[in-house]
Amino acid sequence: MFPHPMLYLLKHQLFQKDRSLLFFVSFTELAGKLQVDQTVIQRYIKLLEDNFILFRLQALRKNLRTEVGKTRKIYFWDIGIRNILIQNTNTLEYRDDHGKLWENFCVSERMKYLRYHNLQPIQSFFWRTYSQKEIDYIEENQGLYRAFEFKWSPKKQGKLPADFIDAYSNPEFVTVNPENFGEVLYQI
């Protein structure tokens, strides 16, 4: 057993070997690595959520055999906390984790916007298949889906996987980059 499982969880288990945030989290796997019960991990994560350190997104799933269902993505409300934990406070030109930083920033800003405007009917998810097809962030409101793909480079365009289009009829889709994020993230 580790002396401070929560600190170990934050510093070593939520991050991959390359020091970038491990978005996809399995409580069972973390519990095994930390040699604690899975409920301990869940309580630690809940405590960090209750103190506005991080938050989770659940997977969107229509019970298709190809969709990941029990995995969650974990994001930090404040990217500065993430940077301190991985001991990397360098400016962007000296970093290799632009994509993960950008995704965390965009998802957290969108979630803050939705909470501030009390838009509770909107539910937030991510989507992923076992064959690694993924959508970074999805909002569902009264049966309508809006999918977001976050790209650091304005030259790159995201694309909706055909599996998603087939399963979730007529979704709206937008690629968010540094040039358009204000127009996209801060609107209803």
Feature names for model-found ranges:
Residues 43-53, 57-188:
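A cross-kingdom feature that marks ATP-driven nucleic-acid transaction machinery
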